[in-house]
Design a protein with these regions (language model features):
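N-terminal, non-cleaved signal-anchor transmembrane helix
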Residues: 1-73, 81, 85, 93, ...
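Alpha-helical membrane-interface segments at transmembrane helix boundaries
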Residues: 58-66, 98-105, 187, 191, ...
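Cytoplasmic-entry segments and transmembrane alpha-helices of multi-pass inner-membrane transporters
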Residues: 81-116, 143-146
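Membrane-cytosol interface at the C-terminal ends of specific transmembrane alpha-helices
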Residues: 123-174, 180-189, 240-243
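C-terminal transmembrane helix and the adjacent membrane-cytosol boundary/short C-terminal tail
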Residues: 184, 225-252
Length: 252
């Protein structure tokens, strides 16, 4: 009964959204719309393949990759630090405060964080790195906290009963149980962040996104096509690398 009520509520919300926005699906999927979209896409070709622009694009790819990697790493460290009290290890008061902080961090989208960090530290990749780190810390911190709360208690309890210090109980009793989950969460967020990092450039956070915004603003469509292809290639490479790392982890 509960599932039926949820299904009815979701269906009503979707139907109400279509009615409120007055969407005309007939125009969206019409032949004229498809032909217009195709003509627009063809204006981007052929891509710009001059050596100077390809070198510039390669630098943008490296910058975007660095922003996503460093941002994810900083987020993992900050998220782990907040996940410890959020999991209830240090009492209910710190648990409530940490969860509130994690909710705040992840409820603000990356683009909003980027707009704020650009105002704080100026244009460039540092602003993008901070934006990714702050939002992703909220996401990873909550996931880490849930993993810690659901970790098996038996190994930690056995070490504690043997007189092991609390820090070592956590390191040798709890952390090995949740580390595979932590690594999986970090890799998945890195996959997501490589795409987000490419978009953050639209608000001045550096990388391929900033290049794309610049080229589109000048209607350099061939150059924009090259940047878009670089974005797709970078995302595919990161997805492949992440998949290989996960396979290696499972095979060990």
């Amino acid at each position: 009964m509960r599932c039926l009520l949820i299904l009815i509520a979701v269906t009503a919300a979707i139907a109400g959204s279509f009615a409120y926005l007055s969407l005309d699906l007939g125009q969206l999927f019409s032949m004229d719309a498809a032909a217009g979209m195709l003509r627009f896409m063809l204006t981007f070709f052929p891509p710009e393949l001059s050596s100077a622009f390809l070198a510039k694009t390669a630098v943008g790819m490296l910058e975007t990759l660095a922003v996503s990697a460093v941002g994810t790493l900083c987020a993992a460290v900050l998220g782990f630090g907040l996940a410890l009290p959020a999991s209830g290890l240090y009492g209910d008061a710190l648990r409530a405060f940490s969860r509130l902080l994690l909710n705040l961090l992840r409820s603000i989208p990356e683009l909003v964080w980027a707009a704020l960090t650009v105002l704080a530290v100026g244009l460039g990749p540092f602003a993008g790195t901070l934006a990714l780190a702050l939002h992703t810390a909220g996401v990873l911190g909550r996931l880490f906290a849930e993993a810690l709360e659901n970790a098996p208690r038996a190994p930690a309890r056995a070490l504690a009963d043997a007189g092991t210090p609390a820090a070592l109980v956590f390191v040798y009793g709890t952390l090995p149980c949740v580390w595979p989950q932590f690594l999986a969460y970090i890799l998945y967020r890195w996959e997501n962040n490589i795409r987000v990092a490419a978009i953050l450039g639209f608000v001045g956070a550096g990388g391929l996104g900033q290049m794309l915004y610049f080229e589109l603003s000048l209607f350099h469509l061939s150059q924009a096509c090259t940047v878009i292809i670089a974005m797709l290639a970078l995302a595919a490479m990161v997805d492949t690398a992440s998949a290989i790392l996960r396979v290696d982890r499972h095979s060990q």
